[in-house]
């Protein structure tokens, strides 16, 4: 566990990109990030602008909405998690969505999201996800078409039948 002073220093030094087509939601997330001590926050109103901002500012964390016109959150993550074509494939990504269906959570894991966060979001929930990606990052792995954070079950040494496809994971960092 990280002490309060160290956490404050980490948040103060962290650059966060918020990608959401709703201006109000970007404002809410910005306010919550500022309340936990994040000072450098970039915003993008769509997936394409978000990809451009990742390339230009190299954020430490990306918070992306699932449902957006054009490039949605899942496609956004697929593009970012393409190390052959994208310059920052290891950036931690938190999926922020109003859709908590099991299928969405599973798809988020399958495309390479680090953390999943439901709307409406609280400061505590956002802080917990930020702490997770900044102070306890999961190693990145490659398996077939998958590139992203190692599944938690793999890290814990537990493999359920549904995780057999992940058995051939290769550690990349």
Residue ranges and their predicted role:
Residues 43-52, 73:
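Helix N-cap/capping motif at the beta->alpha junctions
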Residues 68:
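Receiver (REC) domain active-site loop signature in two-component systems and cognate sites
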Residues 9, 131-173:
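CheY-like receiver
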Residues 65, 97:
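Active-site residues of response regulator receiver
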Residues 52, 74-88:
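Short amphipathic alpha-helix used as the core "switch/output" element in two-component signaling
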Residues 30-31, 75, 89, 100-115, ...:
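Alpha4 helix (beta4-alpha4-beta5 surface) of REC/receiver domains from two-component response regulators
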Residues 12-24, 29-33, 62:
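Conserved acidic segment of CheY-like receiver
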Residues 57-63:
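Active-site beta3 strand of CheY-like receiver
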